[in-house]
Amino acid sequence: MKPVILAILLVLIPFLISESFARTLPALTRVQVQGNRFVTTDGKRMVFRGLNASDPDKLDKSGHWEKDYLAEMKRWGANLVRFPVHPSAWRERGADAYLALLDQGVAWAGQLGLYVIIDWHSIGNLKTEMYQDPMYHTTRQETYAFWRTVAARYKDNPTVAFFELFNEPTTMSGKLGDCTWPEWKAINEEMIGIIRSTGAETIPLVAGFNWAYDLTDVATQPVAAEGVAYVSHPYPMKREKPWEDKWTADWGFVANKYPVVLTEIGFCGPDDKGAHVPVVSDESYGDAITAYADTHGISYVVWVFDPQWAPMLFSDWNYTPTRQGRYFKKALSKYAGR
């Protein structure tokens, strides 16, 4: 082979492999919104029971970004995986290299029968561009550009069922500046418009304030867009027991009209590794949140499938379940194959 041709092939092969991951259409059927439900295009109702990955960038750096990681989720009973993309990791790795990671993850997930949420994993106030920690720093321009890029790339791949527009909006009681619900609603509508302009029909997931817990404003001012679902992160310490009536008042009522996904739930004991507010509780929380989700047809995703981030689901890379891991592995197994 001539040296010039060989050099050209060496340049093109990584690009072609990356593009093939994005364009490979797996056997999963596209999910869409129908009233307050998720349904596939062939009419099957979907209620998701999933697991949160840690950031693909972190997993790749530690040597654990591999198909078997997602296969273990499938063995636990998951039908959905959430990929949290930290803005800092997106910038440090670079868009093209990070997209190559997502291409791999989406391809593996599709092969395993797992749907995907791509989550822009920031915490703070996108209006003022002030954040809880430097790792979450982003700008509106960067956020909008991220969703334009991701939407264009995965619009034809039904494995990617959801785009979670912003992980946890919060003003931290004014420490991050002010943002009203109408202002936050308008920012989400802008993001959805950018996504739709690419031709993507992927379902946007919209979170409310108080670290994605509170959806009370949706009652009177829902997002002005079709095919949208809403998010809550009802960790156990957000409210005191008994939880159920408070959950209904704060976010559960939304499920009467729109689909709801609890994209982060989980717990750990007060003496468990990584215990922190708002996740400290016990199995009674697991019983309550899973029963509530089952009763109301609400989807959920447990945080987090990693032995370092908390509340962790396993303690080592043999996937030895932690306390909450044992609980949710058993809970998810009830849904496997449905």
In which residue ranges do the predicted regions lie?
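Aromatic-lined substrate-binding rim segments of carbohydrate-active enzymes
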Residues: W65-N125, I187, M191-T198, D282-H296
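Bacterial N-terminal signal peptides
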Residues: A7-F15
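N-terminal carbohydrate-binding accessory modules
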Residues: A22-L80, F209
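Extracellular glycoside hydrolase catalytic/binding regions
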Residues: R30-V31, S62, M135, Q141-F162, ...
